[in-house]
C-alpha cells in the first residue's frame, strides 16, 4: 500500500507539533502497537551504539541482537537521509563514526 503524499505531510506536521517528551510518549503509545514501539526504541538504541564508535559485531553483542539488525542500522547511518545523525547531534549524543 502506497501512502498518499497528503497523508505523509499530515503525519510530518503531527510530529512537528510535539512540544515535550511527555507529548511524544502520548502520541507514540496511541499511534503504535506495543511491539512497534519496542522495535522503534530498539532501533534508536542500536543507532546510538553504532554512532558511538562500536563495530557492528561489538554492537550486536552489546545489544544482544542479530548482526542483520545492526547492519541495517549501519546502512541507514551511512546512506540514509541524514536524519539519524541530525538528531544524534541535536540531542548531543556521542557521534564517533558516520559524521
Regions found by a protein language model. Name each.
Residues 1-16:
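General nucleic-acid-binding
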Residues 23-43:
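Short, Lys/Arg-enriched anionic-surface-contact patches
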Residues 40-54:
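Short, amphipathic alpha-helical "recognition" segments used to contact nucleic acids or chromatin
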Residues 58-63:
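Short alpha-helical "recognition helix" segments of helix-turn-helix
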Residues 75-88:
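Short, solvent-exposed alpha-helical "recognition" segments
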Residues 87-99:
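Intrinsically disordered, low-complexity basic tails/linkers immediately adjacent to helix-turn-helix/homeobox/MYB/SANT
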